[in-house]
Amino acid sequence: MSYRTLLVHLDDSPRCRVRTDLALDLALDLARRWDAHLIGLYVVCQDLLEPLRRPGEPLELGVHERLTEQRRKAAEQQFLKAAEAAGRAVEWQAPAGAPSHTVIRHARHADLLLLGQEDPDDRLSHVAAHFIEDVVMGAGRPAIVVPRAGRVSSCGENVLIGWDGSREAARALADALPLLAHAKLVDVVTVESLHSDPDRTPAGVDVAAYLERHQVRAAFSTVPRERAAGAGETLLDRATELHADLLVMGLYSHTRMHERMLGGVTRTVLGKMSIPVLLSH
C-alpha cells in the first residue's frame, strides 16, 4: 500500500510557502519509497468582492486582475524552483472554476492531499467557507492539513491516532497506513466520552492489534476528558505531551450541520492545531 500521487493546494497567501516546502519534503520521502508524483494545484478565491476588500489594494477590477495574474505566476515560479532545487519533476495546474468544486474534482484522482489551515488574520488565504471540510468530504481522499503558524520540521515520525470507534476514525486509520508503516512512534489515544459504550467501541488494544498485523507497533491509552475541555482540545494537549508531529483523525463523527452550527472535535482541531493533521471521511 502506498501513496503514488500527492496533490498540494497552493494559493497566494504568505503561508503558502510552508505548504510548498512541506509538500516537497513529503514528496521526496514518498518518491524514495514509492516514486510518488507531485501535483501543485493553484486555486484561489474567485469571489470578486473578497479580493477587492483587501486593505491597501486598489479597487479597479483591471488592477485586481493583473495582481491576480502576478500572484499566480509568482506561486508557480516558487513551486517549480523549489522542485528543481530538490531534483524532482512535478506537475503544475491552475484551473478555473469554483474553488471547492475544482479542488474536489482534481483531488479524486490523487492518493493524498495537502491543504493549509485557514488563517482568519490573512485575507489572502481565504478560498471558500469550510473549504477543508468540503474538500475532504467531497473528494473522498485523505488530506494532511498543514498548520498556519510555526515551522514543520517533521511529519509522520511520531504519530498520534485519535480513536473514537467511528467509521470516520476507521477510515482515517486505514488511509494513514502508508505513513504509519514508516513512523518511529505510534500512539492510539481514546478520549473518554460522557456516554461511552465499551461494548460498541473497539478498544485501543484492538486497534493496536490491527496495526501490528500491518507491521506497525503502536501503544494505546485512554485519557480522561476534563469538564472545561472538549475531546478536540484533549487530543491536541495529548499530542503536545507526546511531542507528536502528526495527528490522525476522522472528519465529522457528527453530521456536518451539527459540527458547523454547534462546533465539535473537527472544528476545534482545525482552529487550534499546531502540528499537521491527517483527516479522512
Which residue stretches match the model-derived regions?
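A short acidic, glycine-rich active-site loop
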Residues: 60-74
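P-loop/Walker A phosphate-binding loop and immediately adjacent motor/lid segment at beta-alpha junctions
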Residues: 73, 77-86, 123-147, 208, ...
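Glycine-rich, Arg-bearing micro-motifs that act as flexible, cationic patches
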Residues: 18, 115-134, 156, 249-271
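Small/aliphatic-rich secondary-structure junction motif
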Residues: 1-59, 138, 155-223
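A structural preference for short, hydrophobic beta-strand core positions in alpha/beta folds
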Residues: 40, 91-94, 145, 188, ...
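Structural beta-alpha unit
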Residues: 1-2, 45, 80-113, 213-247, ...
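Short, flexible loop segments at boundaries between secondary-structure elements
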Residues: 271-281
